[in-house]
């Protein structure tokens, strides 16, 4: 019906790792997620860090697991306390972030391509509002458990990643935005 039901500031991809425009269907919410480090980040950031400091993985709460590096769930996990998966070939998803100060900036292109959500708890509440098991209390527990928990959505939710430099607000006024790319 065109009514906005949720709004949040986001952080998107840097100019070197732009967030791509595409659509998908949100199928899962993952609380206290592991972060499986993508090969590009592993090669460009993690491996050089390991070469400089043999304790790099331990200092960043990371481990080798099944031939790849992953970051364990926790307070400083790069995905924060929850991620929202809509399977796609771009390996892009919505997620929380431990770096909260970026949401207050006018320009917020700081990620490797995923979309960091400024109000992840509120998004989880909205996405799971029709599932009686997922009360606000249970969402809070899952987000803070430190133990990964996958929740399959009963009804998939269409997600459209768009990029607009002009937008018409509820009053019919056109707002123009800086082109971050």
Question: Model regions: which residues?
Answer:
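Well-ordered beta-sheet/strand-loop patches within structured domains
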Residues: 1-181
